[in-house]
Structure formats: C-alpha cells, structure tokens
C-alpha cells in the first residue's frame, strides 16, 4: 500500500556533508519492491575503527550474528545493507546467504571478510536470494562516491515515510570534526541496547574501544528511550565508524581522560537523539509525538520502567490519537509497571495542565482548558511519583487505525 508522509516529518530533509575516506553506492536489487533502491554499500578507503550495539532478541538475524562476531576485530572496510528482507529465521540458508554477501563484498574491496559488516531489514522468515545482492556489489564498489547520504537513507527504508539523517560539525582537538548519521525505522520499535538500523560515521580519529564506550553510553538516552509498539526487532543494529581522516593533524584519542572525549560524546548523544526522535515521528500511522517524563520514583530504573509502561500502553496511545486527556489510563499504566508507587502521592500533568494531584483529580481541572493542547502534534505527559529522586524521559507516538492497516497489509 502507498504510505503518506508522516505529518510529524521534518520540514526540510537535506543532504549531509561528504566525509573524506567514505564512499557510498546504492542500487535497485529488486528484493521486495520494484523501482526503488534497496541496497546500500558503504566503503571505507582505509582501515576504520568500528563499534556497534545490537538487538537482544533471542531470535537474531544472520546479519546480527556476523556483526557481533566480527566486532572484536576492531576494523571496518565496508558495510552492506539491504531492505525488503530481514534474512532472519531463515536457518542454514540464511547463513549461506550472509556468507555469500560477505565474500562478494570482501572480494570487491580486496579486504578480509571480518572487515565487512552487513545488515538486513524487512520481512522475517522469508529466504533472501543472495544473487540479487552479490551480482551488484563489484560495480557498486567501483562507482561508490563521497556524499550520497540522502540516497543511503532512502535505500534502507521499509515502511518509513521519510529518510532519516542528522549531522554535527564541531571543534574538537583544535580541528573541525564531523559526524553523519542515517537511520531507518517506523514499526517494530522498542530497542534494547540498540536501535532499528542506524549507521553513524565520523572523520575523527578514535580507537575502537573508546568508540564502543561512547556509543554504548550515548544510546541509553536516545534509541533506548523510544518506543512505537513495544516490539523489539530481530535485526536491530546500530554501528558507528571513525575514519581518522579529519583534515589536519588530529591525534587518535584512546582514553576517556582525553579532552575530546566529553566534547565528542555530547555531540554524538545529540545526533543519536535527533535520529531517534525522527524514528518515533515516523511511527507507523503516527499523528502525535508523545513525550513521557517521570519524576519522583525510587530509582532511575524504576522511573524508566514506569515511563515505558505509559508510553507502550495501547489505551494511553489511542487516547492521544483521539485527542483525549484520559489521565485515568495513565494511572492504570503506572499501576501495572511493577515497581514501587503510592497511589495517593501521584501527580499528573498533560503539558502544563495538572489533571491529578495526591491520588485524585485536581479540583481545578477543566476539560475545556486542555482541549486545545491535545490538538497539538507534541504531547507531554508528566507524572510525579512522590517517593524519591529517580527520573526518566522516553518518547513514543500515538496508535491510530493506520498502524493496523499498514501492518495488516505488510506482506500483501
């Protein structure tokens, strides 16, 4: 089915700046939909530092298995990504397909297979024909060029309605450093130590172990704090690469005590947060972005558990879709979270409108006053538990009939 662009999409989607030493090619492999690019090949001209976080699903794809195993090598020379087929739950044939893609990519670049990383997204459980990808890789390796980030983001889309890109340019170590990132995701979004698919590249010089440390920290407040439908994918992959090709003499930083560590980490966190919000704003059928802020919990973990319980509640999400400030459903979601709360201490706001205080409806609450707020595209739900100092914020989207239509029609 044809998908309308999300009403929450960015107004302007622009190309990202080229990065020295990074070349990109896309192609039409015809994996699922004809007449669109669905294959991405990112080429690094020199050995490049690599880090990654992946799904914790017990049914991971063959691509995830390979990336996990190769990460310890600490060097990347290429990334192959296909959309339309997840190559997950495909048994021995899935492993053979992954191996064939790895061999073809490594041969095209004349590098080792454990220096190639792969990712697949799309339908689960259907065999992926390797030849449709393998035959294209040699020419893609030759024609790959700097830039092309927008095309790269388009090539990895499935039910996404817009490509997701972000960039940061900043001073670090006396040099201008750039970070580019792309992502895809609209459904099956509830990451656990990872994201849907996202690839981030910087021209900074950073050792793989430090890159891994920064990525693992930055993902917590971004991709690990979003949810569309509470379903964690079999293919969730977030990978980051550092080429060290920044102009000028930029020494590789290899320690958390390096002055650049904090600066770079802050910029990386901001970029991942921007990409994560784009994913939520493209949640299948979404019309409202929902921000859930929980304070006063016994611990930060408890606060996040409560926040996710609210953000994942179908009843809360459908109430937002109906522009109904149904705070009773928020109370329900808090109560079922399974962590310590006191019903008689709860305070709930929608935006700046306080709806409930000390365990009952606010006597000053008036339905008419909040109606205009509920028609906005960004709805903030704040809950104070009243027990401690733990706090957390997560982001979600509403649940509309379009979500059911998109997923009911996905394999048609």
Curated annotation (Swiss-Prot):
Site description Cleavage, residues in chain: 194-195
GO terms classed as biological process: L-arginine biosynthetic process; ornithine biosynthetic process
GO molecular function per UniProt: glutamate N-acetyltransferase activity; L-glutamate N-acetyltransferase activity
Pfam families hit by this protein: ArgJ
GO CC list: cytoplasm
Entry's EC annotation: 2.3.1.35, 2.3.1.1
Keywords: Acyltransferase, Amino-acid biosynthesis, Arginine biosynthesis, Autocatalytic cleavage, Cytoplasm, Multifunctional enzyme, Transferase
Residues that hold substrate according to the record: 158, 184, 195, 284, 407, 412
Function description: Catalyzes two activities which are involved in the cyclic version of arginine biosynthesis: the synthesis of N-acetylglutamate from glutamate and acetyl-CoA as the acetyl donor, and of ornithine by transacetylation between N(2)-acetylornithine and glutamate.
Stated name of the protein: Arginine biosynthesis bifunctional protein ArgJ
Species name: Bartonella quintana (strain Toulouse) (Rochalimaea quintana)
Gene: argJ
